[in-house]
């Protein structure tokens, strides 16, 4: 059975009636506003974003997840819209191991150039013990209108540790390989590291560093984001957190440089038992909760 049909069968299985168990739902939603200044230009880019991530634990080892994101970028003349939707299904064993499947779709729409859609699907495996979580994935992607005979292969691994008081750290490595008959493979590599630390009285510091490298044209994109969030429930009855993040992105293509500085404001609402101290869509979040393609990870971490 191919990964595509494994994804479909898992999603269909989630709709079937199951015995009444101790089901647990959690999630978070983040509404974001950003201002980006790009070097050597007179215009700023305004970004409005909405991210949501939700999980359902059936209480019998089965867990399902939903990841949604959309953002509109406007420089005063042209608009760009990016969107993402992903579903996951996994089964956790009593020894801490897990196996699962995923299906994702990323879409980019740019004024004057039309749109492009990428669909990804594959398998996941993980192991969790004493605050440490190691996961890996392997899958394939399809992009609209690509010539036949071109294949996109995705694989990667991530590590996250929350075993010490008030802190969380994570590491993410991914590669997407484009291969075609008679041509040399093209690799897009992503490496990220991130963490967060809960301070006193509802304050949390978070930060992430992500780098993407495309070997065929010697292109590198480096993004650094640092921020702080505040839990409004410490001072009000609102179950929400506000955040401020400063992001610096640097692009180097064959020796030509460009950079951009972004200031992001966020309002995050936690659902169930999930924390909203690290806002969804932040650089730290893209490393701590990575997607399953180096292409989509790069698209959503830079701005």
Predicted features by range, described:
Residues 183, 214-217, 231-257, 261-303:
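Flexible, glycine-rich linker and terminal segments associated
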Residues 44-50, 79-85, 115-121, 149-155, ...:
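Residues that define the transmembrane beta-barrel architecture of outer-membrane proteins
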Residues 50-56, 87-91, 123-127, 157-161, ...:
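Residues on the lipid-exposed face of transmembrane beta-strands in outer-membrane beta-barrel proteins
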Residues 80-177:
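Outer-membrane pore/translocation modules
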Residues 1-23:
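Gram-negative bacterial Sec-dependent N-terminal signal peptides
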Residues 25-27, 58-66, 94-101, 131-136, ...:
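Repeated loop/turn-to-beta-strand initiation elements of outer-membrane beta-barrel proteins
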Residues 22-76, 125, 166, 262, ...:
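Short glycine/proline- and aromatic-enriched beta-strand/turn motifs that initiate or cap beta-hairpins
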Residues 31-39, 68-74, 103-109, 117-119, ...:
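Transmembrane beta-strands of outer-membrane beta-barrel pores
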